[in-house]
Amino acid sequence: MPSFIKSVTFDCADPIALATFWAAALGSNVDEDSTAEQAFVEAPGWGGPNIWFNKVPEPKTAKNRVHFDLRAPDTIDAEVARLEALGATVTRRGEDIVVMIDVEGNEFCVE
């Protein structure tokens, strides 16, 4: 039997803030046992991996080598507007994809 992805972990400056953004973006909740040092978002109904956020002292210094690709449930423009209201920022618009950054500058795409 092959391995499966149990969780994805972000190093970050503020685990609660980043977990709050991604929980809202993905329709989930920040786990009640989360702390200022480590926060956790359980995968919502889509069954993907859980997401951990660990506080680290050093800042992000380069482009992510891995990122999320989100599928818009309705139109891309509507989803981008919703994510902007949560604190994300558009960095580039393509024909069928929008590149954004979350509240700590982590890149992700909306399709």
Regions found by a protein language model. Give the residues of each.
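A ligand-binding cleft/hinge motif common to bilobed small-molecule-binding domains
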Residues: 38
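Glyoxalase I/VOC metalloenzyme domain signal
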Residues: 1-34, 42-92, 101-111
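Short loop/turn microsegments at loop-to-beta-strand junctions
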Residues: 95-97
